[in-house]
Structures are given as structure tokens and as C-alpha cells.
Swiss-Prot record:
Gene Ontology molecular-function annotations: ATP binding; ATP-dependent protein folding chaperone; unfolded protein binding
Biased composition (Acidic residues): 626-640
Species whose genome carries this gene: Cellvibrio japonicus (strain Ueda107)
Alphabetically ordered keywords of this record: ATP-binding, Chaperone, Nucleotide-binding, Phosphoprotein, Stress response
Induction / repression: By stress conditions e.g. heat shock.
Entry-linked PROSITE patterns: HSP70_1, HSP70_2, HSP70_3
InterPro entries, sorted: ATPase_NBD (IPR043129), Chaperone_DnaK (IPR012725), Heat_shock_70_CS (IPR018181), HSP70_C_sf (IPR029048), HSP70_peptide-bd_sf (IPR029047), Hsp_70_fam (IPR013126)
Coiled coil: none
Cited CDD domains: ASKHA_NBD_HSP70_DnaK-like
Residues covered by region (Disordered): 606-640
UniProt function note: Acts as a chaperone.
Protein name listed in UniProt: Chaperone protein DnaK
Biased composition (Low complexity): 606-621
Pfam families on file: HSP70
Length: 640
């Protein structure tokens, strides 16, 4: 069995790790970076760029450069948070046929799992390049507060990328694994505050030493799947755009190119203000009007940035309060606070967390890498390479069904340890009712319609009977990934109906298979592209070398040789401009043949000249050779 890799599929950045010789290792990508921007670009010549290369060209290709797509995964187009995002991103968010939020690139609608799969493919390739072997299995992390649809959609993304997802693991739990694996004996309770690029999670986790085994038990989890560094960036973008509008009367929101430049500048300024008190945002030629070009120059202080985002930081403390309450612990019971996610580098965030918990957060956990490392540890546990770790995670939201009057009746309460199975008996609402619809919902609201609808199915052929008489047993079964199976059984007839809750990514198995094939086709296209570029480079090198040879040969080249080479070079120069691999290879062969006789002639002359020079040098060479020959003392013995 190959290695099971750990992937942190982040909103802003992604990271891949493995366990090697018992120690976790974060793998550097082809660019030499330990994290990869979760940015995907579709270029005009049909190439798909992922990571730094996509980020670099974002300003010139804003409509087809996708970022923060994880925020759309498993969401409906009409969700308020999606609607808010539409005006803030330069690319197009559209409604899929089933009402999901998808993106549109070059006139083609694409599902978020399909886009995320491109990032996962890059992570897979990074691991394969390092290991020198094929990778097919992975543990992928998700925000703890992801609902069932979002988890299923993440699993779909893995499948599209050609990965068998062995486990979906919560990000704070993964960070706790990374933190707690090397800690000594004894029990301690930690809070993992995870503020990433697009999501926020808080988990209260108990690490216990049970018979020499590290037991990680999640006591409670809470969060907000639409609160993260992207929101901090957007506050700054809004401020810069408003300042510019006040000064010039021009609204930059209508200019995707300007919006993309603003985004990059806002992110850069935010990062700089974590270590300095003031910075300047300077964007020359941001736009133009009838009076000429306009420049954006704004001095920004840390205090100003903090005033813009203070409410976002405070917003993160509400889930923290709830998680502590749900865990049955008090703040004084928390031994350590772990910060995860790039946004926790902001001094205001660190201060808010320290003030709330009454202690400084730990600084010995890398906020960008801890989650991927934890995923790799979980992968090693599943592979049997790590034996002394037991992980007890929880379901983040209450699961139930809609009952009479539109009430949400819970079957599995939030923060229940998973995997778990729970059954409850329900009955009919009307006399002689022969079918019931089981509507599965997820959330904390009492009214079913206010919660997330996960799916519905019918149990038919119930024998007619007075209301309340038939006994219908509904069973909820959550696996270790937090993914739900629901079944309903008529106890009188034994008739059963079940449903695996599918992602609201709305992707059927056929669609996923099609996307897998598309991804494979892309891989084939990428291979052909690399082959074409390689052939082109070879031919260009040959043209240059041949021209240099002809120049150096001067009169030694006959008129026929020169004519043949000139014709072959012209043909090669034409071929190298195109995309026809066969033509490029044919031109390479022709040019090699045309120039080979001249090259051989020159080589023979050089050899002859070299041999002549050696002969002219005669026996004096040995004496002049210097140090090496002088070491042979035997020479002196001839003179005895």
C-alpha cells in the first residue's frame, strides 16, 4: 500500500504533508514553497494554472482566475453569503440547474468541487514528485463547522482529482493532532482557534493519556463557515475603493482589473501591518477618465485597519463562548490555546484571544502547516503506521427530521462523538396514510425550514391504519467522515427505504465520473503540452547551434551544404512557431540531417588539428606536465 498523504485544502492556501520515519514532513511544491495558493486560472490558450503561476497572472486575467472557491462549496446560489460575495469577486458566480452556487469560466459552468479538484491535483503531484511514486490515497481536512453537503462535496473533489479519500477530518482536530502527538504524559484540555482564509472554527479538545495511548477527544466545536481572512481583505478593499471614489468620483467596483489589483494590494497591506505600524498602498494608473490616468495612493495605519475589522474579530468570539459552554468546561479549565490559520498572525486577533482566555496563545505551532501535518498523522493512523493515537471527533450540527407542523425533531444532537447510530420510532399524521416523506435537516433551529435541508425520500406501501398506529423506525448513521446515511423501516412489514445524503454540490455519480474523465483528459492535454514545449525547445536549441556552426565554418562549408542548411533552418523556424508536434519533430530530423555532414567535417578537422598539435609538442610534454608527473620518484632511479 502506498503512502496516505494529508492535505489541508484551504480557502486561500493549501498544503500537503506525509509522515516519514515517524515524523511529519510538509512537502515543498515545484516552486519551492511549503504552501500553495488555492487559486486556479484558465488561460486563453486552454491551459489550467494552479497556485503561484495562477496568482501571478490574476491582474491581467481577472474574469478567469478563481480564488476562495471553497466558500461556495456545497452552497446554494441564493444564500445571503453567496449573494454578498458576487459583488466582491471579479469572476462570475452563477446558479446551477439545481440552484447551487457554481462559477462560470469562458462561458462554461463549473461546480466548486471541480475547481477544488485542480488544487488537490497539484497537491497530489507535489507529493508524487517528492516520493517518486504514485499517490492514490489521502486524508483531506475541512472546517469543523462544515455541514454534510460541504463534506460530501469535498469528498467529490478528491474523487475528481483521482484520490481515494480515506477520511475527511476537521481542521481544528488535525491541528490538535499536530500539537499533541509529541506532548508528554498527562491529560490536558486545549482550545483550537482556527481563523483561516474563508472559515472560522473553534474546538475544545481533551488530550488524555489512556494506557500509553494518546486519546484526542473533541468535546465541542462551533464556528462560522463564512468568516475568514477574505472578509478582512474585503473590508480593506471597500475602504480603499470608498476613499478613491470620494477623491475622484470613480467607482472601482465596476472595473474587474482594478478590483483584482485592489485585492492584491489589500492582502499585502494587511500582512505588512502585522509587523509594522504603517504602510502605503500605491497603485499607479489604477484607472482613467476623460481628464487622464488616475493613481491610488493611501497611507494606512495598523489602528485604521483594526478599526475596520474589529467587529469581525469580535464576531469570532461568539462561537468561542458557545463552544466552551457546550464542552461543559470553564475558561479556567483550558490549559493551552492553539492558533491556526494565517489570519491569526494579526496582532488584534492574538490580543482578543489572549484577553478572552486570560493566557497567551501557544506560538510553537505553525498556523499554516499544522492542519496538513495533522491530516498526515491521521493518514498514518489509518495506514497502521501510528498505533498509539485514538481520535474521537464530533458532528458539528444537530441532525433530525421534519415532523408534523414543520418541527425539526433531533435524532443526533450536535457535538455527539462519531461514528454513531441512532434510531427513533415515528408514526403517521393522518388516518389510512400509506406513505411518509422523510425530510432530513441539519441545524439548531426548532423550525425545520430554518435549517439546512439535506435531502428527502419516501417510504411507501404502508398498510392503511388509523393515524399514530404504524411504527416507522428512522435510523441515522454517521460515519467517521461525518457523512450521514438515513434509513426508514415500517416495523409491521419490514419494508425499508434508505438514502445516502448526497452533496448539495448536486453532483451525481455520473457527473463525478465525467469530471474524473475530464480531469484525466486534462492530464493528457498537460502531458501533450509539455511534450510540445519540449520539442519546441529542442528545435530552437538546434536552430541556434546550427547557425553558430555555419558561422564558425565560414568557407569550410560548401555552397550546397549552406543551401541545404538554410532551407532546413527556414522550415524549422516556421515549424517552431506552430503547435504541430509532428511538424516540429520532422523539422528537427531534417535540420539534424542537413547539418550533420558539416558538423562531422568540422569535428574531424578539430580532431586532426588536435592530434597534430600533440605530435608537434613531442616528448617534451612529459617534462612540462608539472606536478602530477613529478610525483613519480622512480624517474630518479635511472640516474643511479
Amino acid at each position: 500500500m502506498g503512502k496516505i498523504i494529508g492535505i489541508d485544502l484551504g480557502t486561500t492556501n493549501s498544503c500537503v504533508s506525509i509522515l516519514e520515519g515517524g515524523a511529519p514532513k510538509v512537502i515543498e511544491n515545484a516552486e519551492g514553497d511549503r504552501t500553495t495558493p488555492s487559486i486556479i486560472a484558465f488561460t486563453n490558450d486552454g491551459e489550467i494554472l494552479v497556485g503561484q503561476s495562477a496568482k501571478r497572472q490574476a491582474v491581467t486575467n481577472p474574469h478567469n482566475t478563481l480564488f476562495a472557491v471553497k466558500r461556495l462549496i456545497g452552497r446554494k446560489f441564493k444564500d445571503d453569503v453567496v449573494q454578498k460575495d458576487i459583488s466582491m469577486v471579479p469572476y462570475k458566480i452563477v446558479a446551477a440547474d439545481n440552484g447551487d452556487a457554481w462559477v462560470e469560466v469562458k462561458g462554461e459552468k463549473k461546480a466548486p468541487p471541480q475547481i477544488s479538484a485542480e488544487v488537490l491535483k497539484k497537491m497530489k503531484k507535489t507529493a508524487e514528485d517528492y516520493l517518486g511514486e504514485k499517490v492514490t490515497e489521502a486524508v483531506i481536512t475541512v472546517p469543523a463547522y462544515f455541514n454534510d453537503s460541504q463534506r460530501q462535496a469535498t469528498k467529490d473533489a478528491g474523487k475528481i482529482a483521482g484520490l481515494d479519500v480515506k477520511r475527511i477530518i476537521n481542521e481544528p482536530t488535525a491541528a490538535a493532532l499536530a500539537y499533541g502527538l509529541d506532548k508528554g504524559k498527562g491529560d490536558h484540555t486545549i482550545a483550537v482557534y482556527d481563523l483561516g482564509g474563508g472559515t472560522f472554527d473553534i474546538s475544545i479538545i481533551e488530550i488524555a493519556d489512556v494506557d500509553g495511548e494518546h486519546q484526542f477527544e473533541v468535546l465541542s466545536t462551533n464556528g462560522d463557515t463564512f468568516l475568514g481572512g477574505e472578509d478582512f481583505d474585503m473590508r480593506l478593499i471597500e475602504f480603499l475603493a470608498d476613499s478613491f471614489k470620494k477623491d475622484t468620483g470613480i467607482d472601482l467596483h465596476n472595473d474587474p482589473l482594478a478590483l483584482q489589483r485592489l485585492k492584491e494590494a489589500a492582502e499585502k497591506a494587511k500582512i505588512e501591518l502585522s509587523s509594522s505600524q504603517q504602510t502605503e498602498v500605491n497603485l499607479p494608473y489604477i484607472t482613467a477618465d476623460a481628464t487622464g490616468p488616475k493613481h491610488l495612493v493611501v497611507k494606512l495605519t495598523r489602528a485604521k485597519l483594526e478599526s475596520l475589522v474589529e467587529d469581525l474579530v469580535n464576531k469570532s468570539l461568539e462561537p468561542v463562548k458557545q463552544a466552551i459552554k457546550d464542552s461543559g468546561k470553564s475558561i479556567s479549565d483550558i490549559d493551552d490555546v492553539i492558533l491556526v490559520g494565517g489570519q491569526t498572525r494579526m496582532p488584534l486577533v492574538q490580543k482578543a484571544v489572549a484577553d478572552y482566555f486570560g493566557k497567551e496563545p501557544r506560538k510553537d505551532v505553525n498556523p499554516d502547516e499544522a492542519v496538513a501535518i495533522g491530516a498526515a498523522i491521521q493518514g498514518a493512523v489509518l495506514a497502521g503506521d501510528v498505533k498509539d493515537v485514538l481520535l474521537l471527533d464530533v458532528t458539528p450540527l444537530t441532525l433530525g427530521i421534519e415532523t408534523m407542523g414543520g418541527v425539526a425533531t433531533p435524532l443526533i444532537e450536535k457535538n455527539t462523538t462519531i461514528p454513531t447510530k441512532k434510531s427513533q420510532v415515528f408514526s403517521t399524521a393522518d388516518d389510512n396514510q400509506t406513505a411518509v416523506t422523510i425530510h432530513v435537516v441539519q441545524g439548531e433551529r426548532k423550525q425545520a425550514s430554518q435549517n439546512k435541508s439535506l435531502g428527502r425520500f419516501d417510504l411507501a406501501d404502508i398498510p392503511p391504519a388509523p393515524r399514530g398506529m404504524p411504527q416507522i423506525e428512522v435510523t441515522f448513521d454517521i460515519d467517521a467522515n461525518g457523512i450521514l446515511n438515513v434509513s426508514a423501516k415500517d416495523k409491521a412489514t419490514g419494508k425499508e427505504q434508505s438514502i445516502v445524503i448526497k452533496a448539495s454540490s448536486g453532483l451525481s455519480d455520473d457527473e463525478i465520473q465525467k469530471m474524473v474523465k475530464d480531469a484525466e483528459a486534462n492530464a493528457e492535454a498537460d502531458r501533450k503540452f509539455a511534450e510540445l514545449v519540449g520539442a519546441r525547445n529542442t528545435l530552437e536549441g538546434l536552430i541556434h547551434a546550427t547557425q553558430k556552426t555555419v558561422k564558425e565554418a565560414g568557407d569550410k562549408a560548401t555552397a550546397d551544404e549552406k543551401a541545404a542548411i538554410d532551407a532546413a533552418v527556414k522550415e524549422a523556424e516556421e515549424a517552431v512557431k506552430g503547435d504541430d508536434l509532428a511538424r516540429i519533430e520532422a523539422a528537427t530530423t531534417k535540420l539534424t540531417e542537413a547539418s550533420s555532414s558539416l558538423a562531422q567535417k568540422l569535428y574531424a578537422e578539430q580532431q586532426a588539428a588536435g592530434a597534430g598539435a600533440q605530435q608537434a609538442d613531442g616528448t617534451g610534454k612529459a617534462a612540462d606536465d608539472g606536478v602530477v608527473d613529478a610525483e613519480f620518484e622512480e624517474v630518479k632511479e635511472d640516474n643511479k
